[in-house]
A protein has these predicted regions:
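Soluble, non-transmembrane domains of envelope/secretory-pathway proteins that act on or interact
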Residues: 1-89
Protein backbone atom coordinates (compact mmCIF):
# COMPACT_ATOMS: atom_id res chain seq x y z
CA UNK A 1 0.00 0.00 0.00
CA UNK A 2 0.86 3.65 -0.09
CA UNK A 3 3.29 5.06 2.46
CA UNK A 4 1.77 6.84 5.45
CA UNK A 5 3.28 9.22 7.97
CA UNK A 6 3.87 7.32 11.22
CA UNK A 7 5.37 10.24 13.15
CA UNK A 8 4.52 12.93 14.01
CA UNK A 9 0.79 12.21 14.27
CA UNK A 10 -1.70 14.72 12.93
CA UNK A 11 -2.38 17.48 15.44
CA UNK A 12 0.74 16.81 17.52
CA UNK A 13 1.93 19.65 19.74
CA UNK A 14 5.65 19.45 20.47
CA UNK A 15 7.68 21.67 22.78
CA UNK A 16 11.11 23.20 22.35
CA UNK A 17 13.10 22.87 25.58
CA UNK A 18 15.44 25.85 26.15
CA UNK A 19 17.50 23.76 28.60
CA UNK A 20 18.57 21.31 25.88
CA UNK A 21 21.11 22.47 23.28
CA UNK A 22 19.35 23.52 20.10
CA UNK A 23 21.37 21.17 17.87
CA UNK A 24 20.27 18.19 19.97
CA UNK A 25 16.56 18.87 19.50
CA UNK A 26 15.68 17.13 16.28
CA UNK A 27 12.48 15.59 15.02
CA UNK A 28 12.71 12.34 13.07
CA UNK A 29 9.95 11.96 10.49
CA UNK A 30 8.84 8.34 10.12
CA UNK A 31 6.81 6.63 7.39
CA UNK A 32 5.16 3.20 7.26
CA UNK A 33 4.71 1.20 4.08
CA UNK A 34 5.30 2.20 0.50
CA UNK A 35 8.44 0.10 0.03
CA UNK A 36 10.49 2.85 -1.61
CA UNK A 37 12.26 5.91 -0.27
CA UNK A 38 9.61 8.61 0.00
CA UNK A 39 9.97 12.33 -0.60
CA UNK A 40 8.95 14.77 2.13
CA UNK A 41 7.91 18.41 2.12
CA UNK A 42 7.51 20.72 5.10
CA UNK A 43 5.24 23.72 4.54
CA UNK A 44 5.53 23.10 0.81
CA UNK A 45 9.34 23.01 0.70
CA UNK A 46 11.21 19.79 -0.14
CA UNK A 47 13.24 18.28 2.69
CA UNK A 48 16.66 16.97 1.64
CA UNK A 49 17.13 13.23 2.35
CA UNK A 50 19.96 13.97 4.79
CA UNK A 51 17.64 16.22 6.84
CA UNK A 52 15.03 13.45 7.01
CA UNK A 53 17.63 10.87 8.09
CA UNK A 54 19.48 13.08 10.59
CA UNK A 55 16.38 14.78 11.93
CA UNK A 56 14.85 18.19 11.38
CA UNK A 57 16.03 20.84 13.84
CA UNK A 58 12.79 21.90 15.48
CA UNK A 59 11.70 25.51 15.74
CA UNK A 60 8.49 27.10 16.99
CA UNK A 61 5.59 27.39 14.59
CA UNK A 62 2.87 25.49 12.75
CA UNK A 63 3.88 22.99 10.11
CA UNK A 64 2.33 20.80 7.44
CA UNK A 65 4.32 17.70 6.56
CA UNK A 66 3.55 15.87 3.30
CA UNK A 67 4.75 12.50 2.06
CA UNK A 68 5.09 11.68 -1.65
CA UNK A 69 5.75 8.41 -3.46
CA UNK A 70 8.42 7.94 -6.13
CA UNK A 71 5.93 9.07 -8.81
CA UNK A 72 5.34 12.38 -7.03
CA UNK A 73 1.87 11.48 -5.74
CA UNK A 74 1.05 12.75 -2.25
CA UNK A 75 0.25 9.73 -0.09
CA UNK A 76 -0.20 11.40 3.30
CA UNK A 77 -0.23 14.73 5.12
CA UNK A 78 -0.07 15.71 8.76
CA UNK A 79 -0.05 19.00 10.63
CA UNK A 80 1.83 19.65 13.85
CA UNK A 81 3.02 22.58 15.90
CA UNK A 82 6.06 23.33 18.02
CA UNK A 83 5.77 25.55 21.08
CA UNK A 84 8.57 27.31 22.87
CA UNK A 85 11.25 29.89 22.29
CA UNK A 86 14.28 29.08 20.19
CA UNK A 87 17.50 30.48 21.66
CA UNK A 88 19.75 32.45 19.31
CA UNK A 89 22.26 30.38 17.30
Amino acid sequence: GAARIAYPPDGAVLSFDPDIPRERQRLIFLADGGGQRPTWTLNGRPLPPDTVQAGWEIRPGRFTLCLFDSDGNRTDETSFSVRGVTPPP
